[in-house]
Design a protein with these regions (language model features):
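Sec-dependent signal peptide hydrophobic core
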Residues: 28-33
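A Zn2+-metalloprotease active-site environment signal
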Residues: 2-19, 24, 37-298
Length: 298
């Protein structure tokens, strides 16, 4: 079978031009997408910006400290139970606090990658103390005094919890113990050089984590990180302002031991207000997502 010769040179040229144009458009589009991706801030770049946790903390084994915290926490629970001060699981305020924690804990690993593996726990102790704490490893306790005296809203209670959790996430206790060890070791070496007596083992962790006093910089750090945590959990971070105003007023009526190492109330409020522009968009996005999830369940 014979085929007639057909001249396709013109058609081939036009086809080549169209292909080249399409390729250029695709290449340009890909370049624009790549540029947009490179210029887009990563997901972790929103919210507050804090420096790295103190490197001194590495002098203290995290696992050992967290195990010590578990032991001390269990002792606190047993003592409170014997005195009738450990409120039951079905108590309205216990249920409330655990619901708040259930929203904050899932976002905690933003500031500490090990937080997801911690055995988190929340208890409420019947006591007039205006206080709360979170031990290394996620062991949380509130005193009824802080809830009742300050009449905390859910957002304000979340701010207290976020602040205390931030101490654990940023490993402030671990760093404080490390600093104490270095001081003790230095004193021991100096005592040895001067012919002094014996000194206790500088590598011993010590027995009372609740007696540790955080520095003012630790407290400010915990405020800022706590602000970020509650915003991601869809709690209003502006509650940080109202909370510390309540704390300041309560301190005027009767000086609070809780605030003895904390920054002054006015400075604290100013620092929180300064960081609100960084966390309000995070809060609004989290709130919208939470409301959307609630609507989808109906």
């Amino acid at each position: 079978m014979r085929f007639s010769h057909i001249n396709l040179s013109g058609q081939n040229s036009a086809l080549a031009q169209r292909c080249a144009a399409k390729c250029w458009i695709k290449t340009a589009g890909a370049a624009i997408c790549l540029l947009s991706f490179l210029l887009m801030p990563p997901a972790w770049a929103d919210g507050v910006s804090v420096g790295k946790a103190s490197r001194l903390r590495n002098l203290v084994p995290a696992a050992e400290l967290e195990q010590s915290a578990v032991v001390e926490y269990e002792q606190i629970k047993k003592q409170a139970e014997l005195k009738g001060e450990l409120l039951p699981d079905n108590h309205a305020q216990v249920v409330r606090l655990r619901a708040i924690a259930a929203r904050i804990i899932p976002v905690a690993d933003r500031f500490n990658s090990r937080a997801g593996g911690w055995p988190w726990e929340v208890i409420l102790l019947k006591s007039p103390q205006i206080n709360a704490f979170c031990m290394p490893g996620g062991k949380i306790a509130f005193y009824t005094g802080i809830l009742d005296t300050l009449k905390l809203t859910d957002d304000e209670a979340a701010m207290v919890m976020g602040h205390e959790i931030a101490h654990a996430l940023r490993e402030h206790a671990r760093a404080r113990i490390a600093k104490g060890q270095l001081t003790q070791l230095g004193a021991g070496i100096l005592g040895g050089l001067l012919g002094g007596g014996h000194y206790t083992d500088a590598l011993q962790l010590g027995g009372n984590l609740l007696s540790l006093k955080f520095s003012r910089s630790d407290e400010t750090d915990a405020d800022i990180v706590g602000l970020d945590l509650i915003a991601r959990a869809a709690f209003d971070p502006r509650a940080g302002v109202t909370l510390w105003k309540k704390m300041t007023e309560a301190n005027k009526r009767s000086p609070l031991e809780l605030l003895s190492t904390h920054p002054a109330g006015e400075n604290r409020v100013k620092e929180i207000e300064k960081n609100l522009p960084q966390v309000m968009p995070v809060y609004q996005a989290a709130l919208k997502a939470r409301q959307g999830a609630a609507m989808s369940k109906r």
